[in-house]
Regions:
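Short hydrophobic core segments
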Residues: 6-8, 31, 176-187, 312
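Glycine-rich FAD pyrophosphate-binding loop
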Residues: 23-42
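Active-site substrate-recognition segment that forms the wall
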Residues: 16-24, 46-47, 52, 85-87, ...
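Helical element adjacent to the flavin cofactor pocket in flavoenzyme catalytic cores
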Residues: 138-175, 179
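N-terminal Rossmann-like FAD-binding beta1-loop-alpha1 element of flavoenzymes
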Residues: 3-29
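C-terminal catalytic lobe of FAD-dependent flavoproteins
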Residues: 266-338
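Residue-level detector of alpha-helix initiation sites
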Residues: 11-12, 35, 302
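Dinucleotide-binding Rossmann-like beta1-alpha1 core, especially the glycine-rich loop
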Residues: 46-129
Length: 338
């Protein structure tokens, strides 16, 4: 392996990999064809939330490990570069649909079996939160594991940490076609299958920084530390334009109904981007088949921000130590004819 490692892509996977290699003492140069966070990592939401704990599998375990380690990982990033990534473990609250109590009880049992004890779920009739969604059943499911991060601040914090540790970031220039870690988002999925999925989100001006995030009827509502609340997002397959439209307005309206505290908060920013969804629906991490010295870190889709620390650590272990901790389902496989 060359003394300098090239990373292609300035989204969350590329930045996390570059940081992990830099903090382990390797010289890194990251190329971003546009600017840091120009793609799917430049949105608003930043929900670091676990998958439902039922039907446990390797992907859920990797995500859980990353969520548990996130507090220390992001604290180190912020300290290294002097930029706050906007991370906080504030928990999550979800309304329970009428008749779903038995299913929620099973979910709570599964969380006890797989999550750390401190992170467990519970049902409550009296949620202690500034931002409480409407619940037709009068019950809410809460957890203490879920965290939030500001995607744009996270990208800026990682870039600052990389540079502070001697790494180089080149914006406005694509990476050369040479051995590298390829973390190029939806555009980089073509050899492996998968597709880009459009998402739209909005940012409201409302200071609820310490409130837990809300997940209700498919909508994420995330209070951030800077006096804003993020709302998202749409899931639009086979749509590649980056314009916001009436689908986002419907999400905003729905969020205001679900959380009446948002009713009068003004919208201060709207965003649309293309998220990379791998064919397997799991992240792609590992060597690029048939291209010695080339590696892939892609397919974060909706969980890229949550998974990035674990993905970066597993790839660094493989590249630097020859230690393979990557679940078999994550290894990149070329699509037929790819």
């Amino acid at each position: 392996m060359a003394s300098e490692i090239t990373v292609a892509g300035g989204g969350i996977f590329g930045l996390a990999c570059a940081w992990e290699l830099t903090r382990r003492g390797r010289k890194v140069r990251l190329f971003e064809a546009d600017r840091i966070g120009a793609g799917a990592s430049g949105g608003h939401v930043g929900a670091l939330a676990p998958h439902a704990p039922e039907n446990w599998n390797d992907k859920k375990q990797v995500q859980l490990d990353a969520l548990v380690a996130a507090t220390d990982w992001w604290a180190e990033v912020g300290a290294a570069g002097g930029v706050d990534p906007g991370y906080a473990r504030t928990g999550r609250i979800q309304p329970v649909a009428p008749g779903a109590e038995a299913r929620m009880a099973e979910r709570i049992r599964a969380a006890r079996a797989h999550w750390p004890q401190w992170a467990g779920m519970e049902l409550t009739e009296r949620p202690q939160a500034a931002l409480v969604p409407v619940s037709p059943s009068g019950l809410w499911l809460v957890d203490r594991l879920t965290a939030r991060i500001s995607p744009r601040r996270a990208g800026a914090a990682l870039a600052a940490a990389i540079r502070a540790q001697g790494g180089e970031i080149v914006e406005g220039q694509a990476a050369p076609d040479a051995p590298a870690i390829w973390a190029t988002g939806a555009a980089g999925l073509a050899p492996f299958g998968g597709n880009g999925v459009k998402g739209q989100s909005a940012l409201l001006a409302l200071d609820m920084a310490d409130a837990p995030q809300v997940f209700a009827d498919g909508i994420h509502v995330i209070p951030h530390a800077d006096g804003t609340v993020a709302i998202g997002s749409t899931t639009e397959r086979d749509v590649l334009d980056r314009r916001t439209d009436e689908q986002l307005e419907a999400v905003i309206d729905k969020a205001r109904v679900l959380c009446p505290a948002l009713a009068d908060a003004p919208v201060i920013d709207r965003w649309a981007g293309i998220r990379p969804r791998a064919r397997s629906r799991a992240p792609l991490v590992g060597p690029w088949p048939g291209r010695p010295g080339h590696y892939v870190a892609n397919g974060g889709f909706k969980i890229g921000l949550a998974m990035a620390p674990a993905i970066a650590a597993m790839l660094a272990d493989l590249m630097l130590e020859g230690r393979d901790r990557i679940p078999p389902g994550f290894w990149p496989k070329l699509r037929a004819g790819g």
